[in-house]
Amino acid sequence: MLSSRLPKDLSPSPFFAELERTKAAVLAECAVADGRVGNAGRLPFIDMTVSSPLRVGLPVDLDAAVEDARKDFGCWNPDAAGWKSAREAVVEYYRERGGNFTAGQIILTASTSEAYSVLFKTFCDPGDVILTPMPGYPLLDTLAQLEHLECAPYFLSLKRENKKKIPACAGMTSGVDFRFILDTDSLLAAPEKAKILLLVSPHNPTGHCISREEWNAAVRFCEENDMILVVDEVFGDYGFSPEVRRSWEYVFGGKRDSRLRGNDCGRESLWDAGGGDFINLPEDGPKCPIFWLNGLSKAVGSPQLKLGWMAFYAPRERFEEIRAALEFVEDAYLSVSAPAQALGTALLKHSAAYESRVKGRLLQNWQTLREAFPSKYCPEVLGGWYAVVRLGEDDEELTLRLLKEKHVLVQPGFFFDFDEDGWVVISLLQEPALFKDAVARMRSLADS
């Protein structure tokens, strides 16, 4: 009766069922202890998997945005690509960061997940293959499966690097020597039916950010194999070093000081697509279409508002055909609501200030983690909201022991398809005092 798109078994795995039971028992124990006198030594529960800024004291000022946007909540002006005013707000978001997109290169979606779905529908047929990073976030496989697509891995490998070549993160020393890199040779094993290469930068969960050399290799691979390049950069605002680049800079050129001198991408440097529609498509740009995915979920910490977007580049001779195809798919759903577009327009004005608040938290927690664990066990994070730690025992046993003995919840590495045992994934969003406490407990377990 059910579609073959769905997994044959929808029940939780035995491990995750046990993890949920253990978590419930720990929470009950902590609740009882909180009500007793003389239990000051009891360890409180700390969630190191938290993924929403709303849960850790980092909300955006939504009330002010609502007042600004309320007048447009009842507006019904359907546009397959999204309201032009909202797309122009996204253009301004990029401009503040040195980007030169135009409104004609922006397509709004109800979420980043929906953006994937639109791209899969536009470019793939059932049975085609998406190349995804390993380790990587498991949602990507699910989204592909729901479109009758298959995933094949390419690899991020842990390498020891020359310390002098690794840029120091803000407020930190450059004494680290382990980091994840893109294994470009692993791309060569791609199946013939591969249609899309998916990069995630900053990567969840390793914190890898795509370098220029890695980018050039990925673009060359897509050009040679007539593939689409998709870059998930939902964590793009949260690079830890000034040396970390947004990958669209490799296509359009970066203007790092644009916040001070403004965007100088004049009309004379744009391509006239007709009808007064000017698009930034460099004549000497890549020969493959490229899409960058992002959204309010991370840009302003508002996953509840459900607004994402894709910014895209294509060779000039293919741009109009691709945009028409994307709008055809979008027009079938028109899933982006008026309130979401109105609020997004208002909130993106404050994205730079929000980015600064969150990045300060992330850097503080990353420093705490690196002081507790050497680079060999805690590889360099170049950006994002997560870090990985290798504690050297079975993932499942380690995760359960941390929860039972130390009341710290982490995610096991196998959930992200690490090819070796002993990895756990932790969020860098948690409140700094709680984060420091949790890291100390992790360290004590590792030393025991």
What name fits each language-model region?
Residues A31-R42, A152, L158-F178, R246-A273:
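Intrinsic disorder/low-complexity segments
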Residues M48, V90, I106, I130, ...:
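Generic structural signal for small/hydrophobic residues in well-ordered secondary structure
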Residues Y250-F252, S269-W271, N280-G360, A446:
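Conserved core segment of the aminotransferase class I/II
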Residues E92, N100, L188, R401-L409, ...:
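PLP-dependent enzyme catalytic core of the Aspartate aminotransferase-like
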Residues Q341, T345, G360-R370, Y377-L391, ...:
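Conserved glycine-rich beta-strand-loop-beta hairpin in the small C-terminal domain of fold type I
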Residues D9-S111, V118, S335, L347-K349, ...:
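N-terminal small-domain helix-loop-helix segment of the aminotransferase-like
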Residues G74-K164, G175-C222, G236-R245, A273-G285, ...:
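Conserved core of the PLP fold type I
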Residues T132, P153, V231, V410-P412:
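Hydrophobic residues in well-ordered beta-strands that form the structural core
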